[in-house]
């Protein structure tokens, strides 16, 4: 009975051990996830800053009124649109980093 228990433990330990290729794939995925998160965080930071500037310009536009207010509203709208583009670009770059890692892993498995 004890022999079967030891044998079962050894079999489960062997099943849990990762090959060097699997470890390398895990490291690639982890690195890609981290790069993607960094990219998204940087894009969010830049976009938040632009949205804050847009909000400030909207407030100034409301106070200024007239043509000056209209100019400020146009600038605010442009900054808001730019912030959306920056977020989208960050998301796309993050997706590309993850897809690149997946492609590298698949290529290494096919060798």
Question: What are these language model-derived features?
Answer:
Residues 38-41, 45-111:
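Intrinsically disordered, glycine/charged-rich N-terminal periplasmic/extracytoplasmic linker segments
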């Amino acid at each position: 009975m004890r022999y079967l228990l030891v044998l079962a433990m050894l079999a489960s330990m062997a099943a849990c051990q990762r090959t060097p290729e699997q470890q390398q794939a895990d490291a690639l995925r982890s690195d890609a996830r981290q790069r993607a998160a960094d990219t998204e965080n940087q894009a969010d930071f830049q976009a938040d800053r632009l949205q804050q500037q847009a909000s400030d310009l909207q407030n100034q536009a409301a106070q200024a009124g007239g043509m000056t207010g209209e100019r400020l509203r146009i600038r605010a709208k442009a900054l808001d649109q730019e912030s959306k583009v920056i977020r989208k670009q960050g998301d796309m770059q993050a997706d590309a980093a993850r897809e690149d890692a997946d492609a590298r892993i698949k290529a290494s498995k096919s060798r």
